[in-house]
Amino acid sequence: MGMITTQEFVNTFKSYFPSISETDFKNAWNSMLLDFPLYRLSFLKSLANSKKYRIFLLSNTNDLHISWIQKTWGRKLFSEFKNCFEKFYLSHEIHLRKPNKNIYEFVIESNKLTPEETFFVDDTEENTVVANKLGIKTWQINPNSEDVVDLFSKKEFN
């Protein structure tokens, strides 16, 4: 993530599937993005406005996903989402990716965080295991049965 341009990424996949159009490839690539209901944005806004926690986004993503999200959500909604976070870390911009430990160390060190006082939510076991080994508290959320808005009612986190 972030080590090649978006066009190089698309061309690499197209070399394996030459019959697929670039548009069809991009649509297929973006189809993996999950729905983001507005009540989650409300939750994030209230969490950010409480000023009780420092909130960061750390995402393995590329420009195709971000461009699609911005286009689909619209600039206003995307801006509202992004403004909930103190810092917005995207793998394609920082040239690091989960689950490599250097991405977690980068965020911890760049923001002078204490791992034991840091809470990381992710839906991928690999990512939470590595973060936990660094002393970070984790919640491997199951997107099929759990919702981040239930963070305070379901987890010992206050």
What is the meaning of each model-derived region?
Residues 1-26:
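A metal-dependent, Asp-based hydrolase signature
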Residues 1-5, 66-72:
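A short secondary-structure junction motif
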Residues 15, 23-59, 101, 145:
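Short, acidic loop-to-helix structural element flanking the phosphoryl-transfer center
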Residues 39, 65, 127:
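Short phosphate-engaging motifs
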